[in-house]
Amino acid sequence: MNNAAGVRAAVCRFTILGWSFVMAEAQFDIVIRGGKVVDGTGAVPRKADVAINGDRIVAVGDVEGTGTREIDARDRVVTPGFVDIHTHLDAQLAWDPIGSSSCWHGITSVVMGNCGVTFAPVKTEDISYLAEMMESVEDIPREAILEGLPWDWRTYGEYLEFLDGLPKGINVGGMVGHVAVRWNVMGEESLKEEPATQQEIDAMCELVDEAISSGALGFSTSRTLLHRTPDGRPIPGTFADDNELYAFADVLGRHDRGVFESAPRFEKAGADWTGLKHEIRTLGEITRRSGRPSTFGLVYNAVRPDMSDVALAEVSTENSNGATLRPQTTCRPIGVVLGIQHRTPWARAGSTWKSMQNMEL
């Protein structure tokens, strides 16, 4: 980035009817003028111009050159594009290339494939099942998923090639999900609480290895009991034992790239937080084995409001012991919780919702 802002415009001289004119040629494609720049480094916000050529910022400061397009940013904040690390746009991008509503809020890059739910790897006979998983977990209609995607891939790498060929208004990356990987290898057995055999773990690791080699940003899993199949059972991977999770961590470690993302099982935290601490310690061990970071959802719990503080303290302990844990939080539109058109209120109903569930509208 060129912070020396004294880049002067070129000039063009021409004559019309004896008069001589000098017209400045634009030095930049875009100049954003006079905004308060918050650059994401922790530096103090400052008033500055930002000049852009092509897809690169080429000057920040008092830019003297002109732009083909000039944007008046006075009384506005100018920032780099935000990265939304937790989305489920895996299907939506096929019919909504700008990735709304993420793009409406300054987000220019999204990460998909969270919570273990992805559309690859997939066998032909399992296409409908993976669509049902996304509907059940993330409230995205199965019919839209089946009709909106071509489903002409089988590996995660082929799915990434499909994404690469789409016209897109945002940058896109994705993680390979435990649900698809486990179901691909184990089928119906993937839903049971019994641990996978070593042969099954090896087969799953081959699929994860293919995904990471092809450009996946990491591996995701769901351990929370809130994520259910359409018939009410916890989704594949929920009951995977530590050995299985460590095997996936080892794949990331061999590649020395990728993140391990988890929807943790905090609803079994325990009266003395034993369950919560075990969950975080397991994730900590995953990062120590792999040398790769792990991120997981951590949201406020109205029933146990001190849960977040306990979790953060345990994260601090793990990180001081060589782990690399990065909790993430989220915000949700109020309609997801209070509206009656979604699965979420009913599937996770408290006593108030249950009393309403069978009432006539």
Question: What are these language model-derived features?
Answer:
Residues 95-218, 255:
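Divalent-metal coordination cores built from histidine and acidic residues
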Residues 23-33, 37-81:
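Histidine-rich, glycine-flanked metal-binding segment
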Residues 157-168, 193-361:
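Histidine/acidic residue-rich metal-binding segments in metalloenzymes
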Residues 35, 55, 75, 86, ...:
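Divalent metal-coordination and catalytic microenvironments
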Residues 78-101:
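Di-metal (Zn2+ and/or Mg2+/Mn2+) metal-binding site signature of metallo-dependent hydrolases
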